[in-house]
């Protein structure tokens, strides 16, 4: 009888210990979240693309064995000032691409490069002029 209780205590202790370990390994994404402002800028004139309403696609590094994969986090549309404010996870590689009517541009940022409240200028180039 005593050995059965001892075995039960060991099983319960091992279960609680493994549960505690698994919860400690889970990342809290809320502390890695930062807010950035993305500006769509014309490469030739170096001015913001005002009233163009470009599409901004944000992707973050995913799981990949031989090649990196980039999972789509969100798709946003710039406002009349040519910018959009978003929240992203700063602990992963971030790929930001901007596309609009006959324009395309993008950039990739490593972890730790983007800071909270930072403005990011993405230069877009006209596809017709290429």
Whereabouts are the PLM-identified features?
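Short, acidic Ser/Thr/Gly-rich low-complexity loop/linker segments typical of extracellular
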Residues: 64-83
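Short Pro-Gly-centered beta-turn/loop motif in secreted/extracellular proteins
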Residues: 79-95
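A short, amphipathic beta-strand motif
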Residues: 34-43
């Amino acid at each position: 009888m005593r050995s059965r209780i001892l075995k039960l205590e060991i099983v319960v202790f091992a279960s609680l210990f493994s549960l505690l370990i698994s919860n400690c390994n889970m990342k809290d994404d809320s502390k890695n979240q930062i807010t950035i402002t993305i500006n769509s800028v014309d490469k030739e004139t170096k001015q913001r693309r005002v009233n163009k309403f470009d599409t901004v696609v944000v992707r973050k590094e995913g799981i990949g064995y031989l090649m990196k994969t980039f999972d789509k986090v969100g798709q946003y549309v710039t406002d009349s000032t040519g910018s959009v404010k978003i929240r992203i996870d700063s602990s992963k590689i971030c790929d930001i691409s901007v596309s609009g009517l006959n324009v395309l541009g993008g950039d990739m940022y490593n972890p730790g490069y983007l800071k909270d409240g930072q403005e990011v200028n993405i230069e877009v180039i006209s596809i017709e002029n290429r």
